[in-house]
């Protein structure tokens, strides 16, 4: 019985070693997409419970015609589209801030993204009022969601980057990491 367990463990170890590791770019893209989908879904829930006046499908407003964009299909497409756009934001974080190991750069990154969306890109979205016209509930809710998005993406990318570097260092020094 013991030999079959050992054989199974050895086979699992061989399979893990034979699998090609996921590239850092793949990890960044996955983190960005998942972060965008997760936090835009949270934003949609906040919209449903009237914590925010802004729904994720605001992203479709200037580019797509029809009323369908304000309903279920429009919301799903918007959440996925935000996930795709978020891949670019994740790569931007990776290029600029990946070496920083604390949570604060991610939180500040989320704040910068909020400022960009609500001050710089606001004129693109005709259905979104200016920040001075939004309710305080909307402002606070959206800031919190952007801060959490920045924390999620930033800390995940920094962790993966530093973990990958420590694995490379351990291999270079001939040490085995678990």
Swiss-Prot record:
Any one annotated GO CC term: plasma membrane
Subcellular location field: Cell membrane
Membrane spanning stretches: 29-49, 76-96, 105-125, 139-159
InterPro entries: YqhR
Coarse class of the protein's main subcellular location: membrane
Record's bilayer topology term: Multi-pass membrane protein
One Pfam family, short name: YqhR
Keywords, sorted A to Z: Cell membrane, Membrane, Transmembrane, Transmembrane helix
Protein name listed in UniProt: Uncharacterized protein YqhR
């Amino acid at each position: 019985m013991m030999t079959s367990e050992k054989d199974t463990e050895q086979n699992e170890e061989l399979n893990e070693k034979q699998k090609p590791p996921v590239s850092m770019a793949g990890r960044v893209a996955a983190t960005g997409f998942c972060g965008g989908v997760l936090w835009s879904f949270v934003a949609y829930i906040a919209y449903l419970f009237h914590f925010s006046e802004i729904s994720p499908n605001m992203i479709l407003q200037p580019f797509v015609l029809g009323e369908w964009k304000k309903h279920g299909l429009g919301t799903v497409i918007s959440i996925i589209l935000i996930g795709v756009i978020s891949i670019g934001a994740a790569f931007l974080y990776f290029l600029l801030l990946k070496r920083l190991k604390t949570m604060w750069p991610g939180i500040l990154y989320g704040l910068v993204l909020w400022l960009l969306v609500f001050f710089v890109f606001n004129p693109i979205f005709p259905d979104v009022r200016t920040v001075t016209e939004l309710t305080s509930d909307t402002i606070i809710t959206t800031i919190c969601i952007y801060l959490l998005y920045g924390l999620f993406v930033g800390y995940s990318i920094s962790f993966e980057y530093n973990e990958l570097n420590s694995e490379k260092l351990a291999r270079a020094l001939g040490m085995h990491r678990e």
